[in-house]
C-alpha cells in the first residue's frame, strides 16, 4: 500500500520562545543523530506540547504520544488537533466503558464471566488510528497504555481489506460475501457504522473507521461503474473517488484458511490438556476445558469468530509460544517516533501491566477455564516494549531514574516559560492550624475570583475537609478515585468555569492538568514522607499553581523533610532561572488566558455495544441541549431512537420509556431550530 507523503503543517499564532528554540534544536539534532532515548525536562506551563509539535513538524515522521490516562490523552489529542488540523491526528485508548475480565476465585468456587460494554465512538477512533498509520506518513496517534495490549495481527488485518477500484470486474455477490467476511452486517433500515445496504445494483457501505463518510458502489453488470463518497446522515454527495479500501470491522478479523489452521492447532492443544487433567485426576477441570473449548471451536467454524476469540490469538496470529502479541506498535511505521508524556508515571505503568494480567490468567488455566495458550493473550512485557519502541523522547517535569539512566543523564532543559510566569512561591506552615489556615487563604482567593486545590493524604481526611469547608459556605467539590474519566474532566472544567472554587483530592491533582485559574495549592501533612509526599509528587502538585500570575504553594508540616527540601530547592532553581531570563529580555510575567475549551465529548455515546451493566439514562431538560447545528441534533435523535429500540428489544421497557421522553424533548428543540 503506497503511503501519502504529505508534510506536517504546524498551525500556531506563536513562535518558539524562552527555552523552546534550544529544546527543539537539541531534540531534533539528537533524533537525526540516531539517539534512541532523550529526556525533555519541561516545567508546567513551559509549552512542552508545543515543543514536541515543532519537533514532529521538523522531522516529518509519524509519531505516537503515550499518555498515562484517558484524561491527559484527551487533552493532548485536542492540542495536537489544533496544531495539525491538516494532518491525521488520531486517538487510541481502551474502548471499554465498563470491563469485567473473566476470572475464577478458587476459595469460593466463583467464576466471573467476562462482561463489557464497548464505546462505539472510541472503537471507531481506534480503527481510524490504525488506518492512518497504514495509509499515511503524516500521522500522530495519541494513545494511552492501551497501546501495549494485544491487537489483531497486522498482516492478517491487511490481507482482509477489500480494495475497490473503478472499472474493476467483480460481481455483487462477491462484494457482499467479502463484506460479511469483514464482519459487516446488512441493514437496509438503520444505516450505521459497519453496515451496508443494497438497492438494486447500488451498495452503500458505512466504513467501520469512519464517523461521517460512507461509500456508494454502483455496478453495471459485474463492473464497478462508480465509487462516490456521501454523508450518511443527509445523503449529500461528497464527490467521486477512483478507488477505496474497506477496512475490517475489528482488528481481530482473520482469513478463513488461517482460522481453519488455528482450529486444528487448538484441537491438538485440547487433547494434550485433557490428557494432563486425566493424569492428574482432575476430572472436573477436564470436562470444563473440553466443553468450553469445543463450543468455541464450533463458533469459529460457523461464524469465523467466538466470544473471547482473543484467547486464541497465539494461533490466529501464527506466533510461537511466549512471543510478544501484535500491538499498535506493529501498525506503526519503522521510522516512527515515540513520545512518552509524564514519563515518570507512564513508564512504571507499562512495566506493571503484564504481571497483574498474568496472575489472573494462570488461575483460569489451572482450573480448566482456558487453554495454556491463553497466557499469550497479554500486554507486552517491559523488556518487549523496550525492544519494540522506536526512537523515544521522555517528557516530564520530574523525570524518573529510568529515563535519566536511558538518556545517560543528558537532559534537555525547558525551565523558562515564554509567558515569563514564575514558579509558585512556597511557604511552609505548621500542621496544628492547617485547616483554619486553609479556610482563611480560600476566602482571600475567592474574593479575587481565583481557584484553590487542596491535597490530603487519606480519603477520610478529604471527605471530612470537604464537609467542613461546605459548612463554612465554601463552594467545594471532592475528586476521588471512584469518579470515572468523563466526570473527572467535567469537574475540572466546572472548576475552571467558576461553578465552584475549591477542589479537594488525594492523588488526583498532579500530572498535566491545565488549570490557569488555580492560584493556590495547599498540601496538607506535607511532612509525612511516602509516595504521596515524595519529591516528585510534591513538585508535580506545586506545579498546578505555576500557570497563575499569583501562584503560591503552602506546605503544611512541622518539619522540613528531605523530599520537601529537594522540592523547594528545585522550585527555587527554576524560579531564579525564569527571573533572570525575564530581566535579560525585559519580560513582564503575563497571565495565561487559556480559554476553557468545550468539553471533549470523546467516547460519550449513550449506547454501549454490549454488556450486562444497565445503561443509565440521564434525565435532561430540553434546554440542556445546546448542539452546534441541526445536523448534530438529528444525529443525536437517531442515536436515541436506536437506543430506545435496543431497550425495548431487551424488554427494558422503563428505560425505553425514559429514552422516549428524551426523544420528545429533543424533537421539541428541533422544531425551534
Swiss-Prot record:
Disulfide bonds: none annotated. Its main location: cytoplasm. One of its GO terms (biological process) is SOS response. SUPFAM superfamilies: C-terminal UvrC-binding domain of UvrB (SSF46600), P-loop containing nucleoside triphosphate hydrolases (SSF52540). Pfam families: Helicase_C, ResIII, UVR, UvrB, UvrB_inter. GO terms for cellular component: cytoplasm; excinuclease repair complex. GO terms for molecular function: ATP binding; ATP hydrolysis activity; DNA binding; excinuclease ABC activity; helicase activity. Gene3D superfamilies: P-loop containing nucleotide triphosphate hydrolases, UVR domain. Residues 434-600 form the Helicase C-terminal domain. InterPro entries: Helicase/UvrB_N, Helicase_ATP-bd, Helicase_C-like, P-loop_NTPase, UVR_dom, UVR_dom_sf, UvrB, UvrB_inter. It is found in: Cytoplasm. ATP binds at residues 42-49. Residues 634-669 form the UVR domain. Keywords: ATP-binding, Cytoplasm, DNA damage, DNA excision, DNA repair, Excision nuclease, Helicase, Hydrolase, Nucleotide-binding, SOS response. The keyword Nucleotide-binding applies. Residues 607-632 are annotated as: Disordered. Residues 29-188 form the Helicase ATP-binding domain. A motif (Beta-hairpin) lies at residues 95-118. The keyword Lipid metabolism does not apply. Belongs to the UvrB family. The beta-hairpin motif is involved in DNA binding. The UvrABC repair system catalyzes the recognition and processing of DNA lesions. A damage recognition complex composed of 2 UvrA and 2 UvrB subunits scans DNA for abnormalities. Upon binding of the UvrA(2)B(2) complex to a putative damaged site, the DNA wraps around one UvrB monomer. DNA wrap is dependent on ATP binding by UvrB and probably causes local melting of the DNA helix, facilitating insertion of UvrB beta-hairpin between the DNA strands. Then UvrB probes one DNA strand for the presence of a lesion. Forms a heterotetramer with UvrA during the search for lesions. Interacts with UvrC in an incision complex. This is UvrABC system protein B. It comes from Actinobacillus pleuropneumoniae serotype 5b (strain L20).
